A protein has these predicted regions:
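Positively charged, low-complexity intrinsically disordered leader regions
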Residues: 1-37
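Conserved post-catalytic alpha-helical subdomain immediately downstream of the catalytic base
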Residues: 244, 270-332
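Short acidic, glycine-rich surface-loop motifs adjacent to enzyme active sites
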Residues: 159-172
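Structural motif
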Residues: 21-23, 132, 161-164, 193, ...
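Conserved N-terminal subdomain of the carbohydrate kinase-like
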Residues: 20, 28-162, 323-335
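A short, aliphatic-rich alpha-helical micro-motif
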Residues: 15, 157-158, 203-204
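Active-site metal-binding loops of divalent metal-dependent hydrolases
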Residues: 26, 168, 284
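Conserved phosphate/ATP/ADP-binding segment of small-molecule kinases
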Residues: 170-264
């Protein structure tokens, strides 16, 4: 479809205005790199000579990082972490990314979610991930921790223009936390956007959600093979969630926006040839889409901006972010 380029640019320029709260499963990605030396005598495994370790914000933390890069740090996070060494890595990464974590709840019975990826390389090859180690507590929050988080939400939500619920199903977003977040946000007339992988019908009376195609199929209970199926799926999610719009991300096939009153828009993908790593691209879409909605864009223009942002971050390895200047440059090159 045709887009008004001037309108699109005006929305992008306003992405630095809204203040956002990200509620969900906060995590860090620990990226360990080494050069391959030889096969160990102890076991049939590689011996790596360690070269560096990078700490990157992941899961809901990555969504917050994407917001911070675009709006100059007008972002809060609310979630739960442990009281361990990894907690310091998480808060240190928040400090570096200019993310406010004053509403973070510490629970010494839980682990701070950390995903350690160990990668090796030799001089004649690209870096190859060898193993991933997950350190997390997947049980639901205790009643005490849940109550503390909800109290923090009561303080945080009035401060912001929009709320992102980022559910990686690691235990933070209990049924009560979800319901209270939406209830408080609706009371203060705040935008609520959901990024979840399953149980999509749990999120009712929201502004929008951004499921990918496989998660949409699981939720609606049928395979999506064409645009007719996409329309049926979008309509079902609208009914189930009572949302104002649904944005389904379709990978190489772009995006599909369903709005109330049977309004549908298909948005093509803008970058098929330079895809190096899709890790965290969904977080980028959700973050940019939410910022654009809060900046006054409708669902279609917000999705278009999110799509452009995704086309930029997939050119980079690992969880990546983009900037307003990069988005504006991309608009000139794409449209």
């Amino acid at each position: 479809m045709d887009f008004d380029k001037k309108k699109l640019i005006s929305y992008i320029k306003r992405l630095n205005e809204p203040k956002i709260l990200v509620v969900g499963d906060l995590a860090i990605d620990e990226m360990m790199y080494g050069d391959t030396e030889r096969i160990s005598r102890e076991a049939p495994v590689l011996i790596l000579q360690h070269t560096r370790t990078d700490i990157i914000l992941g899961a809901a933390s990555n969504a917050a990082h994407n917001v911070s890069t675009l709006n100059g740090g007008k972002v809060l996070v609310a979630g739960v972490c442990g009281d361990d060494y990894q907690t310091g890595l998480l808060t240190g990464a928040f400090d570096k990314a200019n993310i406010d974590y004053k509403y973070l709840v510490k629970d010494n019975t839980r682990k701070t979610t950390t995903k350690t990826r160990i990668s090796g390389s030799i001089s004649t090859s690209i870096t190859q991930q060898i193993v991933r180690i997950d350190r997390q507590t997947k049980e639901e929050l205790s009643k005490e921790t849940e109550a503390l988080l909800i109290e923090n939400l009561k303080k945080a939500i009035p401060e912001v223009d929009a709320v992102i619920l980022s559910d990686y199903h690691i235990g933070t977003l209990t049924k009560k936390v979800i319901e209270k977040t939406i209830e408080i946000a609706n009371k203060y007339k705040k935008i609520v956007v959901v990024d979840a992988q399953k149980n999509l019908e749990t999120y009712k009376n929201i502004t929008s959600m951004t499921p990918n195609l496989p998660d949409t199929q699981k939720s609606v209970g049928f395979f999506i093979n064409n645009d007719v199926d996409l329309k049926k799926a979008g309509d079902k999610l609208l009914r189930d969630t009572k949302a104002k719009s649904i944005l389904i991300t379709c990978g190489a096939d772009g995006m599909f926006v369903t709005e109330q009153n049977k309004k549908y828009t298909k948005i093509p993908v803008f970058n098929k040839s330079e895809v190096f790593d899709v890790t965290g691209a969904g977080d980028t879409v959700t973050a940019v889409y939410t910022l654009a909605l809060a900046a006054g864009a409708d669902s279609v223009y917000a999705a278009l901006i999110g799509n452009i942002a995704a086309s930029l971050v997939v050119k980079q390895f690992g969880c990546a972010t983009t900037t307003i200047s990069e988005l504006l440059c991309a608009v000139e090159n794409i449209l």
